[in-house]
Amino acid sequence: MARIQTVLGSITPNLLGRTLTHEHVAMDFEHFYKPPPADFQSELEQKISMATLGYVRLYPYSSKENVRFYDEEALEASRKDVLLYKKHGGGAIVENSSYGLKRNLEFIVDLAKTTGVHFIAGTGHYIHATQDASHKNLTVEQMTDLYSKDILTGIEVNGRMVKSGFIGEVASVYPVQEFERHSLLAAGEIQEVLGCGVSLHPHRVSKAPFEILRLYLEAGGRANKCVMSHLDRTLFDMDELLEFAKMGCYLQYDLFGTECSYYQLNSAVDMISDGQRIDNIIKLINEGLVDRLLMSHDIHTKHRLTSYGGHGYHHIHMNILPRMFQRGVTLDQVEQMTVTNPANWLSFSA
């Protein structure tokens, strides 16, 4: 019988509801801090306020407060926005904080209990540079043992075992480092055995999605149980995107709400707008790919939460879906992308 493994236990796929497939509710993004431009240093070193928010929106990774997405203020703001997401029809959130991002399972479990939103926690490894020394030299076999334990046995949180429901996000740079190659191979091996979903994070070059999906597939992982994240900042050319789509994985646009004139994590490209994301998704729907499309926000900094002037986890439901309907996307197609596809990806047989 198909099931989905949440942090509070297994549920049947029909109970999942509208789902955000790539989010964070608490994590440490300080590794990506970038020194602020000299002209704006004083503003970006202050606490986030109406007086400094404009600078933070332009240089989000140059505010130390902004990338500390784990302190008490961040947790309170995150909780508020999860409740807003629930209020506006949200059913589930897939929490992608893996090893290297300091996931907070205790907080995730508490959110699931107190908000009524289903939470699915991930296992797996983020990029090599974010790992603790105890993880940096793990072999493929040790990684497969760890991921299997997280999914089958779980981790103790306040006296109860909390199980991961998928592997992700599994992240890499380009070219892929040896540690990251190990984590991709381990993800593929465990997926083949357990039938779980997997979420991959490519580096910010167009060759990266092809390379890491190939490694995962060669290890035995199934394409139809794998999500390629962050395509809206990685594959800009539609022909190249359609070529990648032939590999058979889920195609995820997960930076909805991120609209900026300067993308700090890759200044060589221009970040697309929500309108362009919608246009691309419609093109993919017209290519017959609606059964492989997913959407999310990848919230990982404070300034994207409503308490800090951001859009929150309900942005897609309240602002994007209405625009899609205006452009001719049908209710059935929206349900496919936001309900059916997430459930199919996350489901595995007992």
Swiss-Prot record:
Keyword Hydrolase: yes
Record EC number: 3.1.-.-
InterPro entries: AryldialkylPase_Zn-BS, Metal_Hydrolase, Phosphotriesterase
Sites where the protein binds a divalent metal cation 1: H22, H24, E169, D298
Chain residues that bind a divalent metal cation 2: E169, H201, H230
Top-rank lineage group of the source organism: Eukaryota
Requisite cofactors: a divalent metal cation
CDD domains cross-referenced by the UniProt entry: PTE
Alphabetical keyword list: Hydrolase, Metal-binding
The UniProt record lists the keyword Metal-binding: yes
GO biological process: catabolic process
GO molecular function, one term: hydrolase activity, acting on ester bonds
Top EC class for this record: hydrolase
Family designation: Belongs to the metallo-dependent hydrolases superfamily. Phosphotriesterase family.
Protein name in the entry: Phosphotriesterase-related protein
Native species: Drosophila grimshawi
Lineage start: Eukaryota, Metazoa, Ecdysozoa, Arthropoda, Hexapoda
